[in-house]
Amino acid sequence: MTERPFWQQKTLSEMSDDEWESLCDGCGQCCLHKLIDEDTEEIYFTNVACNQLNIKSCQCRNYEKRFEYEPDCIKLTRENLLTFNWLPATCAYRLIHEREDLPQWHPLVCGTKTAMHRERISVRHIAVRETEVVDWQDHILNKPEWAR
């Protein structure tokens, strides 16, 4: 019998830093800008990608120095995970926290990001560069399937 993968054996708080980092599927959904209504605090999702996001690969161009380039970049940690209630339903951190398993397309399960892109989980098919946007309101999406 094969040993169960670490995400089926451990809680998020029990994971090593490397295990924690490996949970990220690299979909880029965190890297799309969100707009917040100042009156209602409702979050509006956009298809506008952070300048540091390589849209084709859905990876940060400067991951190690991302906070220097983008001070508003989020840092998802074990301590602040619950404050990011907008995380997509497909997010591994959210799934593991909710005691769900990773989907079959997740790179830790299938070994590649190809399935994630094919299933259109990543943002590569909808994202636009921040520098190309004139009116941000034109880029507000209806609440996507991946957002609850």
Curated annotation (Swiss-Prot):
- Tell me the Pfam families matching this sequence: CxxCxxCC
Write down the superkingdom of origin: Bacteria
The record's section on InterPro entries has: Puta_zinc/iron-chelating_dom, UCP006173
- HAMAP family in the record, alphabetically? UPF0260
Q: Which PANTHER family match?
A: UPF0260 PROTEIN YCGN (PTHR37421:SF1)
UniProt record similarity statement: Belongs to the UPF0260 family.
Protein name per its UniProtKB record: UPF0260 protein PC1_1943
